[in-house]
Design a protein with these regions (language model features):
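Generic hydrophobic, helix-prone segments enriched in Leu/Val/Ile
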Residues: 44-48, 73-77, 118
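Aromatic-lined, polymer-binding surfaces characteristic
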Residues: 29, 76-210
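Amphipathic alpha-helical segments and their boundaries
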Residues: 61, 68-75
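Generic structural "secondary-structure junction" signal
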Residues: 65-68, 120-122
Length: 210
């Protein structure tokens, strides 16, 4: 039974899902106050290092460089730098709970949502072991390990900080849901990617993580 068939069967069974709570949301102050003081200080200090983070732009030619020269480092330095900074800001806000990291978090959310593709240039293909496209097709997302990781990152931010973000504007989390639907849910359910495994197709570490 394929995933979509199994999901439809479960939903039609009338059974309820258990509340999703993999870790404490920012509203659970008891959980965050219970952290060791040294750890809280370290988390806030890491967030302070990236206050005002400029989120450097990724140019189309940065993506194109992999096909042209084989260089993936320049693109990935910017790509992962954005995500690491955003993670530090989110954790710092969860611990401190004063709102001073929120503007930079919102900037980071929209920067990620406005990327043309979440996949890395070396993974920009739909069939395994075929040449990568030189640019991402924003109308047909590719699900690679890091596209799925970006989706998970934004989903976790929404889970952790939804209340705070919605107080500023409901359009922040609405944008996250929109991007997750277009970039993650729909291609996962409607497309077949080589790492999914079907019949004799080989699977890999991407299979469980994606």
């Amino acid at each position: 039974m394929r995933f979509l068939e199994a999901a439809e069967a479960f939903l039609s069974s009338g059974r309820d899902l258990l509340p999703f709570a993999p870790f404490p949301a920012a509203t659970d102050r008891e959980a965050y106050e219970a952290l060791p003081d040294a750890l809280k200080q370290e988390i806030v200090a890491e967030g302070e290092k990236v206050l005002g983070f400029p989120y450097p732009p990724i140019h189309a030619t940065d993506f194109m460089a992999f096909r042209r020269t084989g260089n993936r480092i320049n693109y990935e330095d910017i790509y992962f730098g954005r995500r690491y900074a955003l993670n530090s800001l989110v954790l710092a806000e969860c611990v401190e709970n004063k709102g001073r990291f929120l503007d930079d978090i919102i900037n980071g959310i929209f920067v990620l949502c406005e990327e043309s593709g979440w996949q890395l240039p070396p993974h920009n293909s739909y069939i395994r072991n075929t040449p990568q496209e030189i640019l991402p097709d924003a109308t047909r997302p590719v699900l690679d390990l890091f596209a799925c990781e970006t989706g998970a990152q934004l989903a976790c931010i929404c889970y952790l900080l939804k209340g705070k973000l919605d107080e500023i504007s409901p359009f922040i989390t609405k944008r996250i849901f929109s991007e997750l639907t277009h970039r993650i849910y729909e291609p996962y359910l409607k497309e077949h990617f080589w790492w999914m495994g079907e019949g004799e197709e080989p699977m890999c570490n991407w299979t469980p993580w994606c």
